[in-house]
Amino acid sequence: MKGKVAYVVADLEGSTGTWTKAHTLLGTPEWQEAREELTRDINAVVESLFEAGVKGVVVKDFHRAGYNLIPRYLDGRAKRVSGYYSGPAVGYGKLYGADFALFVGLHASGGNESGFLPHTLTSRIAEIRVNGKRICESELFASILSAF
């Protein structure tokens, strides 16, 4: 990892302390709590990455429109990216020279009966399958990012 740039994808449903749907809904008191926990989770990752020798960290706030991380509490060494972009990497936009990606706070895939708030991208999509196998967002995102 020495000298590399990390691209950290942050989602809310799988972050520390998110255990009800209200935690994922913009503007609720629970959402504010979840934002604080997600920011702490990401700060722990950022700190660990820098301790491991990376030269930079880009954090993509990927839950909904991407306004979940709290900028004033986020480790200042991380570059925060919000919003949804059509390219060059679908959903991600620019990758800022990242060498590898990490996924934090992702959740169960659509169609997973035992997972917490299971979905893939949106609850309107029942599930996504590739070659007959149901895939989760981390698999989908890894396949998108692998092209870059």
Language model features with spans:
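Extreme N-terminal starter segment of soluble prokaryotic enzymes
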Residues: 2-6
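Short acidic, Gly/Ser-rich segments with clustered Asp/Glu that frequently serve as metal-coordination loops
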Residues: 13-19
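Short catalytic helix/loop segments, enriched in acidic residues and glycine
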Residues: 22-46
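Hard-cation-handling environments
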Residues: 50-52, 57
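Internal, conserved structured core segments that host functional sites
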Residues: 90-147
